[in-house]
Swiss-Prot record:
Chief location of this protein within or outside the cell: nucleus
Coiled coil: 24-225, 302-487, 533-573
Record's keyword annotation contains Flavoprotein: no
Keywords annotated in UniProt: Cell cycle, Cell division, Coiled coil, Mitosis, Nucleus
Record's protein name: Spindle assembly checkpoint component MAD1
Higher taxonomy: Eukaryota, Fungi, Dikarya, Ascomycota, Saccharomycotina
Length: 669
């Protein structure tokens, strides 16, 4: 089909080749013209940049000349101040000479006083050593008494245990004696005691349960308090951030003030330089620097002299302060020793008083023991026939004898202060009461009921506090979450803050560059060192900013390409669904970036056949040609339809729809 000359499916006719060559030449000419115009614009921009740089440097030279004049005026002012400082220095030297003489007299007095205080200190030190020895002896005695006290406490506990066992045996004997006469009463009392014991056990259980609840509530309360503390720390951090912002504003204001001072300083330097038209700028600057160096040397010499005098005065003052400190330390030591002496005398008086009281208590206890013995003798005479009472009395007599021996040993071993406490603990013996058990149970029950009520009230209060604190915690947590969300929204992709950061960086770099340029101009550096590093840093920063912009634009372009490809896929799928052809844009052989000149059309109804891989149409918009690729049947079918619809009627859409219908009739139905 491609061999026939009149066929519309020729790959590349001769007229089309001529048109392609003309198109390529025109495209080359347009590209060259565009490059020439871009070079011209770049040349004009470079010329404008050159002119602006020349104007800037001329303005900078004018400003620097003005600054040199102000510096000259400042140096005149500095010379005047130097003369005034010289006169002040002479006056201060005279005053310092007089003060040195007076200080020497004071030093002699202080040395004499120091010798006297040294002697007193040695005397007090010897006394202090004596007191330390006495104190060590007292400590050793105290340790001995403490050890003896511990031994006596152990003996007392053993005696108390024996006393309890004896009381139990005594109670058993009394119960055996009264069992015959009071059986009914004892039965009722036993029942009552059992009931009380059961109630006591129940109350103890409830008490334990309530105690566990209280512990859990206290733990919850501690956790709530910890969360509250965390909240307080977060609020403190927020306040500190606000303070830091205020500090930052203050520092910016101080920076502006310093820059103003810097400008005024340069103006004074310019004023100080004489305006001679005959001299050049370099000679003026050299003269200015020489004067400045001379003034620096003079200032250094005067500063050294002044520092020497100041150090001498400071040394004298430090010696005086050291002497005063030593004197105050000696006085404080004397006062502390007097206080220790007074406290020890008071302690000795107390010990003597306690000794007298202990002697009186011992006599009282002996009298009470004698009375008890007499009562026991009377009872033994009245109840000679009762064996149990005799045993009871013998046991009591043994107990009294043991107590008597214990009291004698305590008198010998215990110190005066510790005897009183031990005698009091030994004298408090448990009384033998018949109805004591019932009273003890009743009192325990009443106490436990009161404690139960108190614990219930505390539990209710703690539960209420827990609820209120939980609500407050929830409110605080919700507020914190809202604040965090707001803070994140404020920080996330904030272009204003980013722009401010970039501006601040450029401002800092420009100010640094300006300072270094001024330094190079003032110090009169060589041409090799005229270009500072800050200029390179500023250019690098500009490059980085441009690179970030380029990266952002590239990201945006890639995002738009993805969106475009996705949308084009959607459109092509819609076209293939409703019009019956899948469309694919092919790059042109002349320009690979041109994707709209050649279109590949594949019928939707050819997808189920093996021929679908090679049966398709290519429509070239620029060359206005149509090419069929596939089998002979497909090409003949296309030829018939082309003669009918394109050559005769010039209707390409009808040709495409007729081709689709014929493919459907042939392959699908």
């Amino acid at each position: 089909m491609s061999d026939t000359a009149s066929s519309p499916f020729i790959d590349r006719p001769r007229s089309m080749l001529d048109e392609d060559s003309e198109f390529n030449s025109r495209q080359l000419i347009s590209n060259l013209q565009f490059q020439i115009s871009s070079l011209k614009t770049e040349k004009s921009l470079l010329q404008q940049n050159k002119e602006s740089m020349a104007e800037k440097y001329e303005a900078l030279l004018i400003t620097k000349n003005e600054e040199v004049v102000s510096l000259q005026n400042d140096f005149d002012y500095v010379f005047k101040q130097r003369d005034e400082l010289q006169s002040k220095y002479d006056n201060s030297q005279q005053i310092n000479g007089k003060t040195v003489e007076s200080l020497q007299v004071q030093l002699k007095d202080i040395t004499e006083r120091y010798d006297e205080l040294k002697e007193e200190h040695e005397y007090l030190n010897s006394d202090f050593k004596k007191f330390c020895r006495d104190n060590n002896q007292v400590k050793s005695d105290l340790e001995f008494h403490i050890n003896s006290k511990d031994q006596m406490n152990e003996k007392i506990t053993s005696l108390q245990d024996e006393n309890k066992s004896l009381c139990k045996t005594n109670d058993e004997l009394i119960e055996k004696l009264n069992s015959i006469s009071e059986q009914l009463v004892s039965n009722t009392q036993d029942k009552f005691s059992r009931n009380l014991q059961e109630q006591n056990s129940k109350l103890q259980r409830t008490n334990n349960q309530l105690q566990l609840k209280v512990d859990s509530l206290l733990q919850h309360r501690t956790s709530v308090e910890l969360l509250r503390q965390k909240n307080i720390t977060l609020t403190n951090k927020l306040s500190s951030l606000a303070n830091l912002e205020e500090k930052c504003c203050k520092l910016e204001i101080e920076n502006l003030e310093l820059s103003n001072k810097f400008d005024t300083f340069f103006k004074t330097i310019e004023d100080s330089v004489n305006d001679d038209t005959s001299r050049t700028n370099e000679s003026v600057v050299i003269e200015f620097m020489n004067k400045y160096k001379r003034l620096q040397n003079l200032n250094l010499v005067l500063q050294d002299k002044y520092n020497q005098s100041v150090t001498g005065v400071k040394n004298m003052q430090t010696e005086l302060s050291n002497m005063q400190q030593k004197y105050s330390e000696a006085i404080s030591k004397v006062e502390s020793l007097n206080e220790t002496v007074s406290t020890k005398t008071e302690f000795i008086d107390k010990l003597e008083r306690q000794k007298l009281l202990n002697v009186k208590e011992i006599e009282y206890l002996r009298d009470s023991l004698k009375k008890l013995e007499e009562l026991n003798l009377k009872r033994s005479k009245e109840e000679t026939n009762d064996k149990s009472t005799e045993q009871y009395m013998t046991n009591l007599e043994k107990l009294v004898d043991e107590y008597r021996t214990e009291i004698n040993t305590l008198q010998k071993q215990m110190s005066s202060q510790e005897i009183q406490s031990n005698v009091q603990s030994g004298s408090k013996r448990p009384r033998i009461i018949d109805n004591g058990i019932q009273n003890d149970f009743k009192s325990q029950v009443s106490v436990l009921e009161k404690e139960n009520l108190k614990l219930l009230s505390t539990i209710k209060n703690l539960e209420y506090n827990n609820k209120t604190l939980g609500e407050k915690l929830q409110n605080l947590e919700s507020l914190d979450n809202k604040k965090k969300e707001l803070h994140i929204l404020q920080l996330k992709s904030n272009p204003a803050s980013q722009d401010q950061l970039i501006k601040q960086q450029t401002l800092d770099l420009l100010s640094k560059e300006n300072q270094e340029m001024i330094e190079t101009f003032v110090k009169n550096k060589s041409a090799h060192d005229m270009i500072p590093k800050s200029l390179f840093e500023r250019q690098e920063n500009d490059k980085l900013q441009l690179q970030t912009k380029i990266d952002q634009l590239n990201k945006r372009i890639s995002r738009l390409r993805d969106i475009y490809s996705q949308k084009s896929r959607d459109i092509l799928s819609v076209i293939s669904k409703f019009f019956g052809y899948t469309i694919e844009f092919l790059p042109s052989p002349i320009n690979s970036n041109d994707l709209s000149s050649r279109i590949k059309l594949v019928s939707k109804y050819m997808n189920n056949k093996d021929e679908s891989n090679s049966a398709y149409l290519i429509l070239d918009v620029n060359s206005k040609s149509l090419k069929a690729n596939g089998s002979l049947e497909f090409k003949t079918l296309c030829e018939d339809l082309v003669t009918n619809w394109i050559r005769e009627k010039d209707q390409i859409p009808c040709f495409l729809s007729a081709l689709n219908l014929s493919i459907y009739d042939k392959y699908v139905s």
